[in-house]
Amino acid sequence: MAEDKTKRLGRWYFGGVAGAMAACCTHPLDLLKVQLQTQQQGKLTIGQLSLKIYKNDGILAFYNGVSASVLRQLTYSTTRFGIYETVKKQLPQDQPLPFYQKALLAGFAGACGGMVGTPGDLVNVRMQNDSKLPLEQRRNYKHALDGLVRITREEGFMKMFNGATMATSRAILMTIGQLSFYDQIKQTLISSGVAEDNLQTHFASSISAASVATVMTQPLDVMKTRMMNAAPGEFKGILDCFMFTAKLGPMGFFKGFIPAWARLAPHTVLTFIFFEQLRLKFGYAPPVKA
């Protein structure tokens, strides 16, 4: 009897690999999002900013910090996908998990992933934002590992976890928005008979999950980016950063929303499509019940 490949299970590291592959595709959009969020006055549109980066530093400047982006996915996404998928497999499989259980599991996985991924996230934000700084203020990290070493040497080990609370809070919401909503939407489409477990279903589920995740995380994403890119002593803490952002008006919390969605939507779609293809091609059959 031929194996039903749609029943295959993913391996714990597939999420990190899929996230890193997606990051390589969407990094320019992530860079634009970060630079828009760190503007103090919000003078440049996404088109103007793109043109400025191209004129000043060339086309390759859109890939500044790509090594840090890949490092972040290999730590952050490997952890959250690994925990979510591994624990989900240990739960009773006789019926689908209720959504609240998926959300709780995704929140826990996101918290772990956010903490583990903070150093890579910090280097990622700094490298992406470097090109907009004056020459004398640029950090000029050669690559992600150089950034980690220099931060530890020049600013201390704990500096690598600057903004960890914000990053972890965002990761919780992001993982709930992405993993649990993706799972639920995909399950609903398939179980209702509207769709099959195929590429079209993966696309529809992932783009819906990306929209939910963007709305949930954008305010925290803006504050996280500001705190990670801040000079020493610029913000006393999360509340200080919140008050600073609030002074810019309600939309200050949604700076860069369009590029954030434009980046997160394709990144989420690619991540889940890569993940599902890895599962179908290289996953393993579920154990047979005795």
From Swiss-Prot:
It is found in: Mitochondrion inner membrane. It catalyses: (S)-malate(in) + phosphate(out) = (S)-malate(out) + phosphate(in); malonate(out) + (S)-malate(in) = malonate(in) + (S)-malate(out); (S)-malate(in) + succinate(out) = (S)-malate(out) + succinate(in); (S)-malate(in) + sulfate(out) = (S)-malate(out) + sulfate(in). It comes from the Eukaryota. GO terms for molecular function: antiporter activity; malate transmembrane transporter activity; oxaloacetate transmembrane transporter activity; succinate transmembrane transporter activity; sulfate transmembrane transporter activity; thiosulfate transmembrane transporter activity. GO terms for biological process: lipid transport; malate transmembrane transport; oxaloacetate transport; phosphate ion transmembrane transport; succinate transmembrane transport; sulfate transmembrane transport; thiosulfate transport. The keyword Magnesium does not apply. The chain crosses the membrane at residues 12-32, 65-84, 103-123, 163-182, 203-223, 256-276. InterPro entries: Mit_carrier, Mito_Metabolite_Transporter, Mitochondrial_sb/sol_carrier, Mt_carrier_dom_sf. Keywords: Acetylation, Antiport, Lipid transport, Membrane, Mitochondrion, Mitochondrion inner membrane, Repeat, Transmembrane, Transmembrane helix, Transport. It is a multi-pass membrane protein. GO terms for cellular component: mitochondrial inner membrane. The modification N6-acetyllysine is found at K159. Solcar repeats lie at residues 6-90, 101-188, 197-281. Pfam families: Mito_carr. Catalyzes the electroneutral exchange or flux of physiologically important metabolites such as dicarboxylates (malonate, malate, succinate), inorganic sulfur-containing anions, and phosphate, across mitochondrial inner membrane. Plays an important role in gluconeogenesis, fatty acid metabolism, urea synthesis, and sulfur metabolism, by supplying the substrates for the different metabolic processes. Belongs to the mitochondrial carrier (TC 2.A.29) family. PANTHER family: MITOCHONDRIAL DICARBOXYLATE CARRIER-RELATED. This is Mitochondrial dicarboxylate carrier. The lineage of its organism: Eukaryota, Metazoa, Ecdysozoa, Nematoda, Chromadorea.
